[in-house]
Amino acid sequence: MGIILASSSPRRKKILEDLGYNFKCISPNIDESNNNNLNSIDYVLRISESKASHVWRCYKDSHVLSGDTIIDFNGEIIGKPSSNNEAFKIIDKLSNKTHSVISGLSLFYDRKAITIFDKTDVTFKKLSKSIIKNYIESFDVLDKAGAYNIEDAENILIKHIDGCYNNIVGFPLKKFKMSKIKTILDNL
């Protein structure tokens, strides 16, 4: 029995490694569409739970941890862009405005599930079209919710952060440190 991270996110992997956990990664392949028109928190938890349960079905003796991150902009759920053109539109829409980054974590083990989430508000600077274009050409924007990686964007796009920085990275670290998930993983 061990820990499996059901994620392909290098950022989640690094945070878990930095916390001292030994685990293996398995990338789940699930449908992330929002067919049920869920609100942003319910949606991110459903996707996180789906990833964990999908992997757990094949590794029932393991503790499977998964996560998901989305952007909530005035009730609109924004995930990963499918093209640089879509990434441009997303960043342009967020320019000079505040949005919420919501990350969820789910742990599946012994036919049980635990989920947590956190929300961080991020305000973008007023961005010119050329700054957005240069950002998209300089960084990989297609595998990040909202078309940006906080580690690349902080000095370019971001005006203000209110909440947990690591939540923007994709791991609600403050909530995790106080959660039953951490207690369970620490006792394996």
Language-model regions, residue ranges each:
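N-terminal beta1-alpha1 ligand-phosphate binding loop
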Residues: 2-21, 27
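Anionic-ligand binding patches
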Residues: 3, 17, 39-188
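Short glycine-rich, Thr/Ser-proximal phosphate-binding strand/loop in the N-terminal lobe
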Residues: 20-35, 113-115, 119
